[in-house]
Amino acid sequence: MTKNKPKVFLWSLVFSIGLMLAAGSCLADAIDNWIEQFSPSVLSKEDMRKELEWFAKAAEPYKGMAIKTCAENIQTHTYESEVLAKAFTELTGINVNHDIIGEGDVVERLQTQMATNKIIYHAYVNDGDMKGTHLRKKSAVVLSDYMKNEGKNITSPYLDYPGDFLNPEFGYDYEGNTLQIPDQQFPILYWFRYDLFTDPKYMKMFKEKYGYELGVPVTWAAYEDIAEFWTKHVKQIDGKPIWGHLDYGKKGPWLGWRFSDAWFSLAGMGSKGLPNGLPVDEWGIRVENGIPVGATMARGGQLDSPAAIYGLTFFLDMLKKYAPPYAMGLQWSEVGPIPGKGEIAQTIYYCGTFSSFPDYSTPNSPVTDEKGLPKWRMAPQPYGKYWEPGMKVGYQDAGSWTIPTNVTGKERDAAWLFAQFAISKTVSLKKFLVGRTPNRKSVVFHPMWNAETMKPYGGLIEFFRSNERKLFTDTGLNVPDYPLLQEQWWQYISMAATGEKTPAEAMKALAEKEDQLMSRLRLPYLSPKIGEPKGEKYWMGQPGGLKPEIKDRGKAITINYDEMLKRWSQNELR
């Protein structure tokens, strides 16, 4: 028997070498395949190979593990679930189940995990709106610390964070630590029919009636004039109705998002400051040294201020006067495709992701030409009469990678590897082409983009390239418990929509409810301390304080769309 031992050893060695060579060959083939799948990329094919090889090597200690992650139901995340999770598993041997669920379900499951300490998912693509909650509840891994310490060896040298990211500040705490990293982002913008706005017939009609040029509205006063023009004066085009406004007003949680997603910042509520107003943010919450002290005017907040009441009143007036009659019965999930049907001239509320609906790019649709190029454009939303330079303007949704603190050890590491893969330079451009929600500068400044290749996107890429994007930010850090406070919004705002309360009554009741709820919170860090009411007159004179009521509607200002793009190219604002 002993004579055969060298032969057995030799055959075992040959067999082992064969397995290793086969495995190496399989990995090389997989990398070759995915390089083709992920092209075009911001990286050269050589650099794509280096990045993918790094993931394969870094994941070796975790091979055979299984992790679960989740994200909300938009096209970008569906691509991650169907394509990126598969690629990551092939390349690393880590099995990933990337669940696609409703936006509310993402928050609900994350809340449950935080409350019960039971792992439901190892990582979430959770809106950056939650960062104030994560900060105070210490519920998310501080990724900037993790990358420097325990996660240092599995943090990709190719990540290029924060330098290459469009808005990394969407995941920062007050001191600049990273709680969440943007996976994708999309703005809420103004949408309009460029073909109609540049038609000499309508330009002449508008100028004669209103005394200024028809163009992209910069202010709410101009938006209102333009809404009236299409709905009340043009009325029909080619025998079909044309409406000067579209929005949604159905009672439900979506009506809360419509406002908590920075609508009141457009009205001009809050303090100056970027990415969010300090000491008062776009939720009307005042903080002192990071501690929330009130949302009511009497406590230095602004949620029941003249600017907030104006914001709600304007929303209701536009909806009732200038939108199609069915708009009051719409919810968020229904409104996106409607402008693509050809009967809407403009809308002040248009999510960038809506442009992925077929009618916005299908040849010869009501809003495209024979090549499928858009007759529509996107531009920044106009702002209201209380807005001042130095304030944020609108909203960007930033679905961001978030690792709960109860995910530890190897599971945390494996989740971090997949999160990095989903935002890697190798995949980011292809992911944008699918879902139109970028996260990197290298995506929107890629050499493939020129005047012709940007046309199908209707101004979206130009927006992300401009400095204007820095004024459109997500919910800030002042909100101490986002799920708890946000669910109040729709309940009170819907009372104004149905006529049960006036806008002033609804905003006063909402502000008082927010103060009441915040006063009950006992959080581990920077917990609210709701102060004694000092009265509105006191706060009028304080930094970042209240603005007195403005009686007039403000000045009507428009800008020529092409002139705006020219300004952007020169790093100017509109």
Go through each PLM region and give its residues.
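Periplasmic solute-binding protein
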Residues: G128-K148, D164-Y212, E224, D247-T296, ...
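Hinge/lid segment of periplasmic solute-binding proteins
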Residues: A30-P61, G128-L189, L373-Q381, R553-R574
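Extracytoplasmic "Venus flytrap"
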Residues: S44, R49-L52, G64-V83, F186
